[in-house]
């Protein structure tokens, strides 16, 4: 279609709408997104625990284990095994031939503070024999494990903020204003690892990253920010195990 034809069609649609000959209405549509992993061989799932770290304000590993169990009970067809989460950080520390330096053993500080620290522990996620033993204890379920970093972040820069004002005609208008601001918040970086409990072999893994930033003067609890960020990530996690439906709207002309 030529540019002139497009303009003509648009003008006709606008004219018909003005004349009251056309009705526009929205309809809700659902788009299925196929599961990333075939879980048909498994009837049960074990959320085994996570390597957690970042800030001392929140136990990211424990919160993630609890949240995923709750989500899987209501949104998956598998039975969730009720078991305590494995303490994976302590498991790796027990295997060390060289003890940790005294400065690294403070009780209120997490062993894993950043990505560099995490690399010292990640080998347990690919330890086939370890996960095979875990699987044998629970009769070969699908095992979910991984790592989760929940860290404090600060950002400085130019941001856009909406400003509401009243124009000369008395109408309320909104405009975007750009201004420099200091912000603080949290970042969430989980890696979900799916393991065949019958063999200990890793079947699939996927990483995510989200940030939530707030005004420097705003005091947002760590737990509130954690749940805000996990809400964004959960659809991607659940889509690994089952087909998810994404809801949207379409505008139809009648």
Q: Which residues does each PLM region occupy?
A:
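A generic structural signal for short, solvent-exposed coil/turn residues
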Residues: 10-13, 39, 72, 180
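N-terminal segment of the mature soluble domain
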Residues: 44, 48-152, 197, 201, ...
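C-terminal/domain-edge helix-coil "capping" segments
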Residues: 21-43, 137-138, 150-254
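Generic alpha-helix detector with strongest preference for long hydrophobic helices that associate
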Residues: 2, 28, 49, 53, ...
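Sec-dependent bacterial lipoprotein signal peptides
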Residues: 1-21
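Residues at the start of alpha-helices and the adjacent loop-to-helix junctions
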Residues: 2-7, 127, 138, 225
């Amino acid at each position: 279609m030529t540019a002139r034809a497009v303009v003509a069609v648009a003008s006709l649609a606008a004219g018909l709408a003005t004349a009251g000959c056309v009705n526009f209405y929205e309809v809700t549509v659902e788009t299925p997104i196929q599961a990333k992993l075939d879980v048909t061989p498994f009837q049960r799932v074990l959320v085994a625990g996570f390597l957690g770290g970042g800030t001392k304000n929140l136990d990211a590993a424990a919160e993630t284990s609890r949240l995923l169990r709750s989500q899987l009970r209501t949104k998956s067809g598998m039975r969730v095994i009720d078991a305590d989460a494995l303490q994976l950080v302590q498991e790796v520390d027990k295997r060390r031939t060289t003890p940790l330096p005294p400065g690294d053993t403070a009780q209120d500080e997490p062993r894993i503070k950043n990505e560099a620290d995490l690399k010292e522990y990640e080998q347990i996620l690919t330890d086939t024999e370890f996960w095979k033993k875990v699987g044998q204890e629970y009769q070969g379920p699908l095992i979910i494990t991984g790592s989760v970093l929940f860290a404090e972040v600060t950002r400085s820069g130019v941001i856009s903020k909406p400003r509401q004002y009243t124009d000369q005609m008395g109408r309320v208008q909104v405009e975007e204003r750009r201004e420099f601001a200091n912000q603080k918040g949290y970042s969430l970086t989980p890696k979900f690892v799916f393991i065949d409990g019958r063999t200990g072999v890793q079947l699939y893994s996927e990483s995510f990253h989200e940030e939530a930033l707030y005004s420097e003067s705003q005091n947002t609890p760590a737990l509130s920010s954690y749940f805000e960020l996990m809400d964004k990530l959960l659809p991607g996690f659940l889509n690994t195990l089952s087909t998810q439906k994404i809801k949207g709207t379409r505008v139809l002309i009648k």
